């Protein structure tokens, strides 16, 4: 995607506002709005999906440029099978077409690619391509691209619970062994850090069964911009917004025990 001088200048200005010490290492994105984008333009929904692929390539590059380590994108959910069959077929064919075309460049860019989800319903040709692509890029360390295909957060949690139950009933583990670390090890995302930032395009304020366990403490950024219109500038705005927040993980902001007690005493005194 060619950028004009104004866009390049805008991207540079936004990049200069970033705190290089507070770049999120793992960013997750719900890429929403392809169909609506196409419909608004009087085009078939397939045009939106094709444009969405171009945008993803731009955002992968932007993620690497700011030294983000992991990008996880929601490409196809377990619920997406209920869409019209012609759209589902188009999307599955698009995955295969794009992966065939881009895998060499992905490898050359030292990107490790991983597909997350239940891949069993996919065509054999796509499953073989996914397997070979993951094997080819497995030793790449600079950047990881996780693509969630036929993925559902609830299904992932249920699967992990079943695996733990089987191991417990067979005596491989004791109930007392079960903790967050063990549960994490049974998830499809095992070995990957949790996202610090979730970006959702299209203005929808929900997480749509995406990474339900992993997003427990993620900052969430929602933009009204539809995914095909999502640019590097919009991406950088999300990072800047993230950096303006104070991640407390359930705690409180810079408040010592003494000041908390003083605050409580002061409130009680006012009520006397």
Swiss-Prot record:
The keyword Membrane does not apply. Substrate binds at residues 33-37, 45, 49, 77-79, 81, 83, 200, 206-208. GO terms for molecular function: ditrans,polycis-polyprenyl diphosphate synthase [(2E,6E)-farnesyl diphosphate specific] activity; magnesium ion binding. Pfam families: Prenyltransf (PF01255). Binds 2 magnesium ions per subunit. The active site is at 32, 80 (proton acceptor). This is Isoprenyl transferase. Catalyzes the condensation of isopentenyl diphosphate (IPP) with allylic pyrophosphates generating different type of terpenoids. It comes from Prochlorococcus marinus subsp. pastoris (strain CCMP1986 / NIES-2087 / MED4). InterPro entries: UPP_synth-like, UPP_synth-like_CS, UPP_synth-like_sf. Homodimer. One of its GO terms (biological process) is polyprenol biosynthetic process. Belongs to the UPP synthase family. Its EC number is 2.5.1.-. Its cofactor is Mg(2+). The keyword Metal-binding applies.
């Amino acid at each position: 995607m060619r950028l004009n001088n104004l866009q390049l200048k805008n991207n540079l200005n936004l990049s200069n506002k970033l705190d290089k010490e507070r770049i999120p290492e793992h960013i997750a994105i719900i890429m929403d709005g392809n169909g609506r984008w196409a419909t608004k333009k009087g085009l078939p929904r397939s045009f939106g999906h094709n444009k969405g692929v171009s945008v993803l390539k731009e955002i992968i590059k932007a993620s690497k440029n700011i030294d983000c380590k992991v990008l996880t994108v929601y490409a196809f959910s377990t619920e997406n099978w209920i869409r019209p069959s012609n759209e589902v077929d188009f999307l599955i064919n698009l995955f295969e077409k794009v992966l065939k075309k881009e895998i060499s460049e992905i490898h050359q860019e030292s990107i490790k690619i991983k597909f997350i989800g239940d891949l069993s319903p996919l065509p054999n040709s796509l499953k073989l391509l996914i397997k070979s692509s993951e094997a080819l890029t497995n030793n790449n360390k600079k950047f990881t691209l996780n693509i969630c295909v036929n993925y559902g957060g609830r299904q992932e949690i249920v699967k992990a619970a079943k695996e733990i139950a089987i191991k417990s009933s067979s005596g491989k583990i004791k109930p007392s062994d079960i903790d967050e670390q063990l549960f994490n090890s049974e998830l499809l995302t095992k070995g990957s850090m949790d996202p610090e930032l979730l970006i959702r395009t299209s203005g929808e304020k929900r997480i749509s069964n995406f990474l339900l366990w992993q997003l427990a403490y993620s900052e969430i950024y929602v933009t009204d911009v539809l995914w095909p219109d999502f640019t590097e500038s919009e991406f950088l705005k999300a990072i800047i917004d993230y950096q303006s927040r104070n991640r407390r993980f359930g705690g409180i902001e810079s408040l010592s025990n003494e000041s908390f007690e003083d605050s409580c005493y002061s409130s009680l005194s006012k009520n006397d």
